[in-house]
Amino acid sequence: MADNDNEDVIMDDLVEEYVETEEENFVDSEEESEDKDEIVESPSICEGFVQASSQTLVIIPDNERITSNVLTTFEATRLVAVRAQQLAINGSTMLKKKYSSPIDIAKQELFNRKIPLLVMRCIKVTPDGQKIVEIWNPREMGIPLLD
């Protein structure tokens, strides 16, 4: 699983651009989806997403973000679903207390701010193919209540 320290290295003070072609790397269809908000597992997965697409990815620096610092219900639910799927295939938990199901563990990791995933929000796709995104760590975001 992703180490907590690895997630903090994703952003620089400068905007970073990555350009690769589809043939160079392949990632799962979950990261290739065209949703506005995407869940990425680590900085390397984020780079893999860009390498698998034909677009240039521009990451907005932390201090210039324009979207809300609150997770939407969709984002929170997707984080829980992706994390529960990881746990169901023998992923290690970030919690000390025992829970009965992967969904319960994933929810508690989210609410305890220990979930090892990141949220990538697409801000804009320019006509020349640049995809402008913000990458958020759920630990620094407000979390909605999930039933």
From Swiss-Prot:
Main location: host cell
Taxonomy, superkingdom: Viruses
GO cellular component, one term: virion component
GO molecular function terms attached to this record: DNA binding; DNA-directed RNA polymerase activity
SUPFAM superfamilies, alphabetized: RPB6/omega subunit-like
Alphabetized PROSITE patterns for the sequence: RNA_POL_K_14KD
InterPro entries: DNA-dir_RNA_polK_14-18kDa_CS (IPR020708), Pol_omega/Rpo6/RPB6 (IPR006110), RPB6/omega-like_sf (IPR036161), Rpo6/Rpb6 (IPR006111)
A Pfam family matched in the record: RNA_pol_Rpb6
Gene Ontology BP annotations: transcription by RNA polymerase I; transcription by RNA polymerase II; tRNA transcription by RNA polymerase III; viral transcription
Alphabetical UniProt keywords: DNA-directed RNA polymerase, Host cytoplasm, Transcription, Viral transcription, Virion
Subcellular location: Host cytoplasm; Virion
Family, per entry: Belongs to the archaeal RpoK/eukaryotic RPB6 RNA polymerase subunit family.
UniProt function note: Component of the DNA-directed RNA polymerase (RNAP) that catalyzes the transcription in the cytoplasm of viral DNA into RNA using the four ribonucleoside triphosphates as substrates.
Quaternary structure note: Part of the viral DNA-directed RNA polymerase that consists of 8 polII-like subunits (RPB1, RPB2, RPB3, RPB5, RPB6, RPB7, RPB9, RPB10), a capping enzyme and a termination factor.
Protein name: DNA-directed RNA polymerase subunit 6 homolog
Organism annotation: African swine fever virus (isolate Warthog/Namibia/Wart80/1980) (ASFV)
